[in-house]
Amino acid sequence: MRSMKRFLPYLSVLTAMLIWSASGIAIKEALVVLPPMTMIVLRFSLAILLMLLIGLCAPRNSMFALQKPSKKDLPLFILGGIFQPFLYYILETYSYDALSSPTIAEALLSTSPVLAPFFAAVLLREHISIFNILGILISTVGMLLLVLVGASDFSIGNPWGIAFAFAAVSTAVLYTIVLRRIPSRYNPLSVVFYVQLSALVLFVPLCACTDGISGFTRLTQASPDLLCHTLGAVAYLAVGASVIAFICFCYTVRVIGVTRTNAFNNVRPAFTAIWMLLFFGEQLPWAKWVGILCIIIGLFVCQIVQSPKK
């Protein structure tokens, strides 16, 4: 039992990364019918309704019961929602739009493990060991091999795209910092619920300005087959990517810390490559398998705990 509890944070974050690694496929499927902002609002609305239903039906003292936040903690939940998903999704979209190569955008957006130790050390006084740094570097090399090997377009495009990408990564890391600051008395479901509710309050007026009601009327104009695929993709994003994955990630951040949790972001391209191999038959060259191996080795090295010197 104790052994299972010890490995639960790692199993939890790997589950989150596995779900998020397939979310790109679901997003592309949903965007065939829905505009981006409409898709985001629909996704998070369904996620919040699901969490509300679970939270209200769960026994009062269970880990899935929805807890009422105190007034002094509300700013943390709101700040978390501003950082991610609100700012992150907007900056990520602009970075993909400004950079001519999706490959470069994906590589830049995968640098959160590199930035996380510096944010955690400065803002949380989190101890960073040589193993953390070494593991992150090894897994980042693996991530770059996965993303860049076989890519045909390395042009940058608008330099602002680089700034948007790094700003997006910074907001993602700051989100994990906020998660660490939220008092441990709140369970992960309550944390994710209030964070995403804060973001949805910001997304709705933005959606009204950009898409209006026309974004939702596209669902009525789609063919039955296309509608089924779109709703299935949105359901996956709502239940899987926005509820299960966020709760799993939140739990891990609060148990093992910002640096060690963010290191697992490097495994997402590896999972994506495996999804593409299994479902689309996309073959992986040997260099990408080396990249996957580097990511796994780097993650093991990063998780080595070294006590700070007294």
Residue ranges and their predicted role:
Residues 25, 51, 116-118, 122, ...:
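Transmembrane alpha-helical segments that form core, pore/gating elements
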Residues 8-16, 63-92, 159-168, 217-244, ...:
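Loop-to-transmembrane-helix transition segments
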Residues 18-21, 52, 81-86, 90, ...:
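Hydrophobic/small/kink-forming positions within alpha-helical transmembrane segments
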Residues 1-41, 154-181, 205, 310:
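Glycine-/small-residue-enriched transmembrane alpha-helix faces in small-molecule transporters
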Residues 51, 131-150, 266, 275, ...:
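Hydrophobic transmembrane alpha-helices of multi-pass small-molecule transport proteins
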